[in-house]
Amino acid sequence: KGCSFVEAVETLMGKAAVMPTVTVKPKQKTEPKILLLPDKSASTDKITEYLFGRGIDYTIIQYCIDKGLVFESLPYHNLVCVGFDEKNTPRYASFRATNDRRVLGDCSGSDKHYSFRIADSDSSTVHLFECAIDLLSYATLMKLEGKDWRQFNLVSLAGVYSPKQKIEDSKVPVTLGRLLEKDKTIRRIVLHLDNDIAGRKATKALQTILSDKYEVVDDPPQY
């Protein structure tokens, strides 16, 4: 009498005032990813031929090889594009076949906070691309126009950016987020994302979530 339905049931079942013990597991510290790079070939002939066949300027190819930004892997002679942290330690790498097969992906342990980029300048403008090949193609176009491509801040997003269904709730890609956090001089962001549905959706999302702090320019590839 005078008790609630739930209390009555608990009393009848012999569970009144008996609460199960709840064990709270401590949060495990996230260990830094360990990047597993493939073996490196002594030759760069296959990747040079592949990139040159994709229209990339030879000087830019050689620059990337000399800087360790790209290398040819063993045993499959894939093109590997590498991203480094502030200590010049490889933290990200993608691979793609240099033959007709569509084999591509990220190397195990890749951290997209440190994706492939060419950034030898203190420019307040950052140029964003979906992948390393798009970035290198743009650098080639700048060279053809007589501009010093090394003075551009060129960053790959390491894949197609997928915004939230409700665009306003989208998050900044981790690559760009880290860059904006580290470099407070950036004022302008130029988006060179593809003209397909995914690229247009990603562009709209980035314009929506970034335009309050930065000048955001849409400049898709003209091909």
Description of each model-found segment:
Residues L51, C81, N88, E130, ...:
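Terminal peptide-recognition signature
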Residues K1-Y50:
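Non-catalytic accessory segments of DNA primases and related replication-initiation nucleases
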Residues R102-S124:
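Glycine-/acidic-rich phosphate or pyrophosphate-binding loops and their flanking alpha/beta elements
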Residues D122-V126, R188-I189:
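Short active-site oxyanion
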Residues L128-I133, A158-S162:
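Conserved mixed alpha/beta catalytic, RNA-binding, or beta-rich assembly cores of soluble enzyme
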Residues K1, L135-L144:
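Short active-site loop/helix that positions an aromatic residue
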Residues M142-Y223:
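TOPRIM fold recognition
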Residues G53, T59-V80:
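Active-site-proximal, Lys/Arg-enriched surface segment
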